[in-house]
Amino acid sequence: LHVRDVLPDLIQCALMHVQFETIHPFLDGNGRIGRLLITFFLMERQRLAQPLLYLSAFIDAHKSDYYDLLQRVRTHGDWGAWLRYFLQGVTETATAAGQQARELHRLREHYRAQLRDKPNALALVDELFVNPYMTIGRAAQVLEKTHPTAKAAITVLEQNRIVRELSGRQ
């Protein structure tokens, strides 16, 4: 895995995943770790700038194929079918991630337009796309304003249905 340029990174990643799942080194969590290794490997190879490719949804949607193809590699050496499955998963997952990113961008721009005349609330919108958890204290910190000003900004976000209070404490 540390030798570059022998095989394309996605192919190496698919091979690595089968090897890890075959070894099955832990009593619990092998599946989660195996899927995380895909993301970490692609980040280490600088194929991902952020850990935004996680194949769990694809694997869950095609679970019987996943287990059947892993087994076929072990019993029949059928790497071709496994590689097609894996690359299809990467393609579908990357396409979905791209769509989600575009939707989030459109949503953020919609909120920004909605709040263009409310500078404090507008400043919090961008922060919400970094971390969607907001408290009045954190809002005051982000805005570098007082707690009453931060609370007023959050109230504007609530009135515009951008955030809602969940804790019962405000």
Report the location of each language-model feature.
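Basic amphipathic alpha-helical segments that dock to polyanions
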Residues: 128, 150-160
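Hydrophobic, well-ordered secondary-structure elements that form the walls
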Residues: 86, 139, 150
